[in-house]
Amino acid sequence: MVQLHVKRGDESQFLFNTTVDVQIETLTQQICEIYNARLKVDRICTEIPELADHGISLPPNMQGLTDDQIVELKLKDEWEERCIPSGGAEFKKDEIGRRNGHAPNEKMKDVLRRTMEEAKALISKKQLQANVCVTMEMVKEALDQLRGAVMIVYPMGLPPHDPIRMEIENQEDLTGTQASLQVITNEEAQLWWASKELHRGKKLQDYIGKNEKTKIIVKIQKRGQGAPAREPVVSEDEQKQMMLHYYKRQEELKKLEEADDDTHLQSEWSDRQALKRQFQGLTNIKWGPR
């Protein structure tokens, strides 16, 4: 199997196994699907702590308003009585005004948080360090875990406007958000290797040959952004090792310089001409009047 180290810019994303015979069209779709699904898991995991601490999301027309403004405008959250967490709610006001403040109890909070950590671990970049390749099945498992935890805590479900439910049902609207800049659709996705675009319509072996044991770095980006920056000749870890070696060498030279004692150069035994003068009888000669 060919192992691909997928990056976005200079940031590592995940490892992916494929074959040299794969069509670039298929490969792009597979990598793009995993890349975007991992982003979805991250977005849900970002909202889970808010759900655990402050309950369900308020309707859009009530978000950001003070209690007085809500009363004055005669607004009411119709989902508050429908979406009650298992075991009852504990009130904790959301200072931002996005959620209604009726949070789950500690036991249910623990279910949400524990599941969130398990889901994050499945698609974590630490998998790359452990040389574990990510598959779409792994990402789907993470999404299923999150969906299951939400159903346990909220048996009646979440409001249709809650960002977690919208993400789970693929109804999210990321327009105008920072998250939208990270998403890459299959139509606009490009794969690059060694500053070469991997063109759809060709196979991977057209670029890297037929060796199935190849390991390469592939970069994913949006069409029209030009060639991504080349990979540095020396990796970040190798650079750190070189700097450490250089520093240690400098310290060793400094210690040798400090320990360098040349007073012995005045000694008789260090005189290269002493033996010659001894054979010629020129030792112990005193100059000047006696």
UniProtKB/Swiss-Prot annotation:
It is found in: Cytoplasm; Cytoplasm, Cytoskeleton, Cilium basal body. Disruption phenotype: Larval lethal. Animals show strong ciliopathy phenotypes, including pronephric cysts, axis curvature, left-right asymmetry defects and hydrocephalus. Kidney tubules are dilated and polarity of cilia in the epithelium is disorganized. Cilia length and number appear normal, but outer dynein arms are missing and cilia are paralyzed. Morpholino knockdown of the protein results in similar phenotypes. InterPro entries: CFAP298. This is Cilia- and flagella-associated protein 298. Strongly expressed in ciliated tissues of the embryonic trunk, including the pronephric ducts and spinal canal. Pfam families: CFAP298. Interacts with dnaaf1/swt. Interacts with lrrc6/sea. Interacts with dvl (via DEP and PDZ domains). It comes from the Eukaryota. It comes from Danio rerio (Zebrafish). Belongs to the CFAP298 family. The gene is cfap298. GO terms for cellular component: cilium; cytoplasm; cytoskeleton; extracellular region. Plays a role in motile cilium function, possibly by acting on outer dynein arm assembly. Seems to be important for initiation rather than maintenance of cilium motility. Required for correct positioning of cilia at the apical cell surface, suggesting an additional role in the planar cell polarity (PCP) pathway. May suppress canonical Wnt signaling activity. Keywords: Cell projection, Cilium, Cytoplasm, Cytoskeleton. GO terms for biological process: cerebrospinal fluid circulation; cilium assembly; determination of left/right symmetry; motile cilium assembly; pronephros development; pronephros morphogenesis; regulation of cilium movement.
